[in-house]
Amino acid sequence: MAKKAVFKSLYFQVLVAIAIGVSLGHFYPETGAAMKPLGDGFIKLIKMIIAPIIFCTIVVGIAGMEDMKKVGKTGGLAVLYFEVVSTIALVIGLIVVNVWAPGVGMNVDVSTLDTKGIAKYAQPGQMQTTTDFLMNIIPTSVVDAFAKGDMLQVLFFSILFGYAMHSFGERGKPVFELIEKLSHVLFGIVGVIMKVAPIGAFGAMAYTIGKHGVGSLAQLASLMGAFYLTCVIFILGVLGSIAAFHGFSIIKLIKYIKEELFLVLGTSSSESALPRLMAKMENAGAQKSVVGLVVPTGYSFNLDGTSIYLTMAAVFIAQATNTPLDLQHQVTLLVILLLTSKGAAGVTGSGFIVLAATLSAVGTVPVAGLALILGIDRFMSEARALTNFIGNSVATLVVAKWCNALDAKRMNAVLNNETSDEAENPELVLDDAPDVIIPHVPRPIIDHH
């Protein structure tokens, strides 16, 4: 099959759009800032389709399983992985910010900071308890969960629906087939939406540069440098080691998901590429049931980039404002962030909101210090989103392998770019077709009774 021209590839189009957006925002700031609706509109288009895609993927995956015990095993192993890796991310961020000390010497007087920009974030008492977090997973109603697009609530209902349909055996087959066909239609819609991805990336980047300006980067370059370096260390060191231990290369995985990474870079939201990630993980050999559980859950429980950002930003503010933060305070902050970091979704700005809520609840680090990083938070959002996205990609393949739900031969062939005929496997992301993602589930429901 002849490869399509480079300029027709999504990653190339998005990359060019980002470059044009940066140029427009830099040279014509007001015009660039006015492009915000383009980026927002694209994100809304993607979010519009995420909840039904999660529902269909999980229901079809669970209903088609022969052993329902695998669902609980998959979920348990996924949460275990998320907790361990996100804790490592928090600790690495804490270590680097203490060694690099980007805020030391700034000697900022908190009383002189303009806190108008952070007023809407710094509301006291916003931190959720563990009980609140767990209770919020249960939706008030199914309609409300889908209307809000709350991934954990949709995930919860989808698991129940899939389990119930599984128990019906052959009687549930018509519903199974209907939902399977619906999933094909939904992924077809994603393919249509992805046609305007370059426009969304252009609008988001033009707004970012036009609104905040490249000049705002220089003022806090030390913090940004430390954060970006930490993300690279985490991806290549931690995630790279995890990937190598489980039989695949982190570099090859990054190359495999490069189109999605450019999309995430342009929109600063890992959520923007969620549907394509799910399809690509299936294409790489992970079973649909595992992908359906791990990927959506990871968008709340496995935000590695956000975890790094939270510890680094909190300690940076303490350093810049000369706020004493000894080892005991930092350990306390770490423990609290282990809980509050789970409240961040894979959307732009969620990390800043969680940081504000955490500082408001802890009280050790001045909340007013958030004004120091407000101007560069949008630029740090790219690294957060990219790290989150790569982290969830690795998590999906690792958990799939733990659950014996990964076709290692298929994974190696895909990551090594050895799959010459896309017709060999129907669960494919058709990059040479017009960017339409069409997953396929070959097995019907069987009567387990």
UniProtKB/Swiss-Prot annotation:
<keyword id="KW-0997">Cell inner membrane</keyword>
<dbReference type="GO" id="GO:0015366">
    <property type="term" value="F:malate:proton symporter activity"/>
</dbReference>
<dbReference type="GO" id="GO:0005886">
    <property type="term" value="C:plasma membrane"/>
</dbReference>
<dbReference type="GO" id="GO:0070778">
    <property type="term" value="P:L-aspartate transmembrane transport"/>
</dbReference>
<feature type="transmembrane region" description="Helical">
    <location>
        <begin position="77"/>
        <end position="97"/>
    </location>
</feature>
<dbReference type="GO" id="GO:0015138">
    <property type="term" value="F:fumarate transmembrane transporter activity"/>
</dbReference>
<dbReference type="GO" id="GO:0015141">
    <property type="term" value="F:succinate transmembrane transporter activity"/>
</dbReference>
<keyword id="KW-1133">Transmembrane helix</keyword>
<feature type="transmembrane region" description="Helical">
    <location>
        <begin position="185"/>
        <end position="205"/>
    </location>
</feature>
<keyword id="KW-0769">Symport</keyword>
<dbReference type="InterPro" id="IPR023954">
    <property type="entry name" value="C4_dicarb_transport"/>
</dbReference>
<keyword id="KW-0813">Transport</keyword>
<feature type="transmembrane region" description="Helical">
    <location>
        <begin position="332"/>
        <end position="352"/>
    </location>
</feature>
<dbReference type="Pfam" id="PF00375">
    <property type="entry name" value="SDF"/>
</dbReference>
<comment type="similarity">
    <text>Belongs to the dicarboxylate/amino acid:cation symporter (DAACS) (TC 2.A.23) family.</text>
</comment>
<comment type="function">
    <text>Responsible for the transport of dicarboxylates such as succinate, fumarate, and malate from the periplasm across the membrane.</text>
</comment>
<feature type="transmembrane region" description="Helical">
    <location>
        <begin position="231"/>
        <end position="251"/>
    </location>
</feature>
<dbReference type="InterPro" id="IPR001991">
    <property type="entry name" value="Na-dicarboxylate_symporter"/>
</dbReference>
<dbReference type="InterPro" id="IPR018107">
    <property type="entry name" value="Na-dicarboxylate_symporter_CS"/>
</dbReference>
<feature type="transmembrane region" description="Helical">
    <location>
        <begin position="353"/>
        <end position="373"/>
    </location>
</feature>
<dbReference type="InterPro" id="IPR036458">
    <property type="entry name" value="Na:dicarbo_symporter_sf"/>
</dbReference>
<keyword id="KW-0472">Membrane</keyword>
<feature type="transmembrane region" description="Helical">
    <location>
        <begin position="298"/>
        <end position="318"/>
    </location>
</feature>
<feature type="transmembrane region" description="Helical">
    <location>
        <begin position="5"/>
        <end position="25"/>
    </location>
</feature>
<keyword id="KW-1003">Cell membrane</keyword>
<feature type="transmembrane region" description="Helical">
    <location>
        <begin position="45"/>
        <end position="65"/>
    </location>
</feature>
<feature type="transmembrane region" description="Helical">
    <location>
        <begin position="149"/>
        <end position="169"/>
    </location>
</feature>
<protein>
    <recommendedName>
        <fullName>C4-dicarboxylate transport protein</fullName>
    </recommendedName>
</protein>
<keyword id="KW-0812">Transmembrane</keyword>
